[in-house]
Amino acid sequence: VEILIRRHNRQKGGNRAAYADLERAGAMFVYCGRPGPLGNPFRVGRNYSKQRAVDDYRLLLGEDYAKHFPADKVEYVRTRALERIQQIAKKVRRNPTAHRIVLLCPCYVEGEPCHAEVIREKLLEVLEVAK
């Protein structure tokens, strides 16, 4: 399975036009922004870099997340994200022609950190374990 990351175009119909070739090839598109289950809860801001937001998202989805965050504050967000990743993996396993997933993230810029990279890593882990 190939997992691509592309920028989500917020204009109505923008993604469809930009990624028509991928759509024709049967790619599965997954939105990774807020307010969806895969949206990064760590917001980039004055004192919070993009890299730190990605690093914290990686910690959040990791096994040792409770060492880094108060469990009662992040459990819901973490569970939603991991469940969504499992759902996507299940869809891929059920559909033998689903060989390409496109993660659409509003913040994605090639060469810069993006939490969709963490989602790709987790998806590949889940799909590998299922083999």
What are these regions, as identified by a protein language model?
Residues 1-131:
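Residues lining hydrophobic/aromatic ligand-binding pockets adjacent to catalytic sites
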